[in-house]
């Protein structure tokens, strides 16, 4: 599943931890936005890790699920080109 994750976390320490966790699951797109291509196990693990870390009264994490058709309709204007980090072994 393709998930766009955004977060608003005022505490620097928690925000840094969330950023570090998300870097291991997807690609950092903007300051508090990641794009992740996850299977159901990865998603469950990620959601659990994030839920344990945040303070719900102060922090907000939003997850947007994009179907395969919607992924082809994503437009980008400006910014750095998205890198394909696929590794191939020959």
Predicted regions and their residues:
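Extended, hydrophobic alpha-helical segments
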Residues: 1-42
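Short, intrinsically disordered low-complexity segments
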Residues: 33-59
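A broad, structure-centric signal for solvent-exposed, well-ordered loop/edge residues
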Residues: 16, 41, 45, 70-73, ...
